[in-house]
Amino acid sequence: MDQKKDPSNNLTERRVSKVQRPNKKKVRNQVESLSRNLERNKEGQLLQTVSKGHLKADSGHSLGREKENGELGIRSIFYDKDWNPRGTAPSHYRNIPYNPATFKRRTEVQARLGNLENIKIPK
């Protein structure tokens, strides 16, 4: 007998026969595992929606990254008359109003040389 005609030696014939005549026990096990996976996915989606709800509730109190970049002008902590006159926040950061009680601006920069004041600088 030819090897191509013999179904015991032909791999494609065996694969096709398994699909055409499936084993009931294997099919039942596959259906059960798929139903368990579906239940787990539903539980995971429920947890994700609860987490998203908590995230939305906490987003109003966040001092970190934010999508909107409002300009506060001179009231912003990011304001600088030379570098940032509009007071815009860096990308992905929230713009916070300046509070003089908690944040002190330096009006001028003073060099802190310590004991190095005696060194002569070449011209």
Curated annotation (Swiss-Prot):
Q: How does it assemble?
A: May interact with the nuclear pore complex.
Return any one Pfam family short name.
NpwBP
- State the organism of origin: Saccharomyces cerevisiae (strain YJM789) (Baker's yeast)
- The record's region (Disordered) falls at 1-30
> Where are the compositionally biased (Basic and acidic residues) regions?
1-16
Supply the name of the protein: Altered inheritance of mitochondria protein 4
What keywords is this UniProt entry annotated with?
Answer: Cytoplasm
Q: Which gene encodes it?
A: AIM4
User: What's any one GO cellular component for it?
Assistant: cytoplasm
Biased composition of type Basic residues is found at 17-28
Q: What is its main location?
A: cytoplasm
Name the protein family. Answer: Belongs to the AIM4 family.
Superkingdom as given in the UniProt entry: Eukaryota
Locations listed in the record: Cytoplasm
